[in-house]
């Protein structure tokens, strides 16, 4: 099986690297809140899961903003290809942030 790199692989890789540098706090907080939820007793779990979801939504929105800003500079048709590649790259790197990115 031959794997082909996407047309936008390099630029998306750089964008995600910058996101990781600029928003490492969001990535770390999501991991910490998920761990807290997983350790929680039943009576605390619902609130802690809500906290986790809030951080994931923040990260997802930040990533969608990056995606949409760049896609806006591309010709019609090409922008959709870029968006699909971007969403797949996010899913490979941070599954939690990818769950809702297509809906943003």
What name fits each language-model region?
Residues 1, 63, 88-89:
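General helical secondary-structure elements
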Residues 1-38:
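Short terminal alpha-helical segments
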Residues 6, 10, 43-46, 50, ...:
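Generic alpha-helical secondary structure signal
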Residues 23-67:
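Amphipathic alpha-helical interaction modules
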């Amino acid at each position: 099986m031959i794997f082909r790199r996407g047309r936008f692989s390099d630029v998306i890789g750089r964008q995600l690297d910058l996101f990781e540098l600029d928003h490492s706090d969001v990535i770390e907080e999501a991991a910490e809140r998920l761990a807290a939820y997983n350790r929680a007793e039943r009576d605390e779990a619902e609130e802690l899961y809500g906290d986790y979801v809030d951080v994931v939504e923040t990260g997802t929105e930040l990533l969608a903003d990056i995606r949409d800003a760049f896609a806006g500079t591309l010709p019609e048709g090409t922008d959709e290809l870029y968006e699909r590649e971007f969403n797949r790259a996010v899913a490979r790197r941070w599954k939690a942030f990818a769950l809702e990115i297509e809906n943003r």
